[in-house]
């Protein structure tokens, strides 16, 4: 353990680089970039407090950066659902609030914090859009807080499908009914809410999602994987990659290219199969 005075920017940067290699106890996979960003933010807040108390003169976190994580593309293939698995999940939760929740994340390609931070004021039922401008996270000492999204590009307006908007309208009606019937209802105004009106604790929401996957007989793909699934399905359907990147809130279109490069391999094989089906009869005759 180093004394506070010996915590240099280079030491903190080395620590940040190292935690990219740490595996999450929930998924047994490397920590998501958002988790590393949160750790850096919390560490900066702690050391800022140390500055105020005159223990250190400078915050060593200032000047550090979050490196771009390198991912194995073979592993990347395993973190998304197939079209059939998406249908299986949505069929399993049909008629429950979870149908709206997971449709929202898939359709809007939302991060967990963005989805849980969405309020009814962010939903425009007339235009069929949502405004992503909040991030509901667990900060230092597990304190829940509403922050701004991870980057300027993450603040965005997203047009949703008619089906997702229909599900959100049902959830809005459910919210209002619960509010009228329950005098102890907490008017959090969250789109994704617990039955008592309170917003979900991110970890609790994740555990509920994981239990649902298990009950539905689906692989334990993370919520971030659900977001990736939404992006992947849009790209596979032929959507413009720039439009998909903007919709996902990626700060750089290269991020979209890097993560979903494996799609071009899938599409190439599909193209070969199509050509083979066309030419094979001619060759055999």
Region spans (language model):
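N-terminal core-binding DNA-recognition domain of tyrosine site-specific recombinases/integrases
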Residues: 1-55, 198-204, 219-225
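Basic, Lys/Arg- and aromatic-enriched nucleic-acid-binding interface segment
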Residues: 29-33, 37-41, 52-120, 126, ...
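Proline-centered turn/helix-capping motifs that create local helix->coil transitions or kinks
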Residues: 51-62, 125-128, 134, 140-141, ...
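C-terminal catalytic core of tyrosine-transesterase DNA break-rejoin enzymes
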Residues: 52, 103, 107-114, 204, ...
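Catalytic-site neighborhood detector that most strongly recognizes the C-terminal catalytic loop/helix
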Residues: 72, 80, 136-138, 248-274
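Active-site/catalytic core of tyrosine-dependent DNA strand-transfer enzymes
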Residues: 83-86, 161-218
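Short, polar N-cap/turn motifs at the start of nucleic acid-interacting alpha helices
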Residues: 122-129, 239-261
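C-terminal secondary-structure termini that scaffold catalytic or DNA-interacting sites
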Residues: 127, 138-155, 159-164, 170, ...
């Amino acid at each position: 353990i180093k004394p506070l005075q010996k915590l240099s920017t280079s030491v903190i940067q080395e620590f940040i680089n190292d935690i990219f290699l740490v595996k999450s106890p929930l998924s047994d996979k490397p920590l998501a970039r958002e988790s590393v960003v949160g750790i850096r933010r919390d560490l900066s807040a702690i050391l800022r407090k140390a500055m105020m108390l005159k223990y250190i003169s400078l915050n060593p976190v200032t000047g550090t950066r979050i490196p771009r994580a390198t991912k194995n593309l073979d592993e990347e293939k395993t973190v998304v659902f197939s079209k059939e698995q998406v249908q299986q999940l949505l069929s399993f939760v049909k008629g429950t609030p979870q149908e709206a929740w997971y449709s929202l994340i898939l359709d809007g390609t939302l991060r967990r914090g963005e989805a849980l931070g969405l309020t009814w004021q962010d939903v425009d039922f007339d235009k069929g859009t949502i405004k992503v401008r909040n991030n509901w996270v667990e900060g230092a000492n597990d304190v829940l807080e509403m922050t701004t999204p991870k980057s300027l590009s993450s603040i965005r307006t997203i047009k949703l499908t008619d089906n997702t908007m229909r599900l959100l309208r049902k959830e809005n009606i459910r919210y209002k009914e619960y509010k009228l019937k329950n005098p102890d209802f907490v008017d959090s105004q969250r789109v994704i809410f617990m039955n008592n009106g309170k917003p979900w604790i991110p970890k609790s929401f994740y555990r509920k999602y994981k239990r649902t996957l298990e009950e539905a007989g689906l692989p334990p793909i993370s919520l971030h994987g659900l977001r990736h699934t939404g992006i992947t399905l849009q790209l596979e359907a032929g959507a413009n990659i720039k439009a998909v990147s903007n919709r996902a809130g990626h700060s750089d279109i290269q991020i979209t290219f890097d993560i979903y490069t494996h799609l071009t391999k899938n599409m190439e094989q599909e193209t070969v199969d199509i050509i083979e089906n066309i030419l094979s009869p001619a060759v055999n005759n």
